[in-house]
């Protein structure tokens, strides 16, 4: 298994290994018929959240089914947030049960809550890009003396960008100025207003920017730049997002957690396999417009929305 060595994610790796997903205790065999066991279980309120982008896209079929009542094993409610800052206090305070969040934020929450948060799955790999409009950025060193618009301070985008800059001999804040915005949409707006602007964007926001200004291009793929800094085949992989749950919730409702992950996997498979059908609910939930949602899928599918237990 490849190691996860994202800055501040050594702890995350320990969480993944030590906690092993959502399994918590061995149980005595139950010889009741499966239907009888299912009918005897009371529905559980499961409060879930995700960020606008690939992780929220992967949930749309699940959300649709929960809203329509076709998924009825538990009572699921969903929240889509624009920024990790909206979800962090809710997870820490117990008003959310399961959330799709940046990988390093999971590590921070694990430490800040003394292990009260568990990682269930890795759901998003590398979907981050440096974009420009004038072709001036051909390599990481070309960022020297430049200003980069970015969102996600204190989470994966910041740590990944800093790692890549430092690996190429550039010091963030000294050699490269990073102007942090509260949302990726603000970075897109900055690029469309200034032809000299450079931005760090994930998909599908890259496509959103390109649909507004066709001169915007992906100058650098941060996954490729990350891999270029690794020295051996067993080196780290750039992990962007994970699924986490409150430890108390996992212990109290293991069947509900298993059911959630099953529905999530099925939803992810639907999004990957039927782009056109997935685009409509993605638009409906105001994640991104349908026209935008369809375009990044071919590039993002290989790395995003792959849910593993």
Question: Which residues does each predicted region cover?
Answer:
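Short, low-complexity disordered leader/linker segments with a strong preference
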Residues: 1-45
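Surface-exposed acidic, glycine-flexible loop patches that form ligand/cofactor-binding
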Residues: 8, 140-141, 251-252
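Short, glycine-/small- and polar/acidic-enriched structural segments
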Residues: 28-181, 195-203, 215, 219-222
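An extracytoplasmic/periplasmic, membrane-proximal ligand-sensing/linker region
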Residues: 40-44, 210-213, 276-309
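Short, solvent-exposed loop/beta-turn-alpha elements that line the ligand-binding surface or hinge
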Residues: 67-74, 223-236, 302-309
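Pocket-lining segment of extracytoplasmic ligand-binding domains
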Residues: 104-105, 113, 179, 186-281
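Flexible glycine/proline-enriched surface loops and loop-helix/loop-strand junctions
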Residues: 144-146, 242, 301-303
């Amino acid at each position: 298994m490849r190691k996860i060595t994202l800055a501040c994610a050594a702890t995350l790796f320990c969480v993944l290994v030590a906690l092993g997903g959502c399994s918590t205790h061995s149980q005595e065999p139950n010889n009741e018929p499966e239907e009888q066991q299912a009918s005897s279980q009371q529905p559980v309120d499961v409060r879930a959240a995700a960020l606008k982008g690939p992780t929220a896209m992967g949930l749309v079929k699940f959300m649709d089914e929960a809203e329509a009542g076709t998924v009825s094993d538990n009572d699921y409610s969903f929240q889509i947030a624009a920024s990790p800052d909206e979800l962090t206090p809710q997870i820490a305070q117990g008003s959310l049960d399961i959330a799709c969040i940046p990988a390093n934020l999971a590590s921070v929450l694990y430490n800040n809550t003394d292990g009260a948060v568990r990682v269930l799955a890795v759901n998003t790999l590398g979907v981050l890009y440096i974009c420009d409009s004038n072709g001036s950025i051909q390599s990481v060193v070309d960022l020297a003396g430049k200003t980069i618009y970015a969102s996600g301070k204190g989470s994966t985008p910041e740590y990944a960008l800093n790692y890549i800059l430092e690996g190429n001999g550039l010091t963030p804040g000294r050699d490269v100025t990073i102007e942090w915005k509260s949302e990726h949409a603000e970075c897109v707006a900055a690029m469309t207003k200034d032809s000299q602007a450079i931005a760090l964007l994930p998909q599908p926001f890259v496509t959103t920017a390109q649909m507004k200004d066709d001169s915007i291009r992906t100058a650098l793929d941060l996954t490729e730049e990350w891999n270029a800094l690794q020295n051996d085949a067993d080196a780290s992989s750039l992990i962007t997002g994970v699924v986490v749950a409150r430890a108390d919730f996992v212990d109290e409702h293991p069947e509900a957690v298993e059911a959630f992950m099953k529905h999530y996997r099925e939803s992810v498979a639907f999004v990957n396999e039927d782009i056109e059908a997935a685009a409509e609910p993605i638009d409906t939930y105001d994640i991104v417009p349908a026209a935008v949602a369809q375009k990044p899928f071919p590039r993002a599918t290989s790395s995003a929305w792959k849910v593993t237990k």
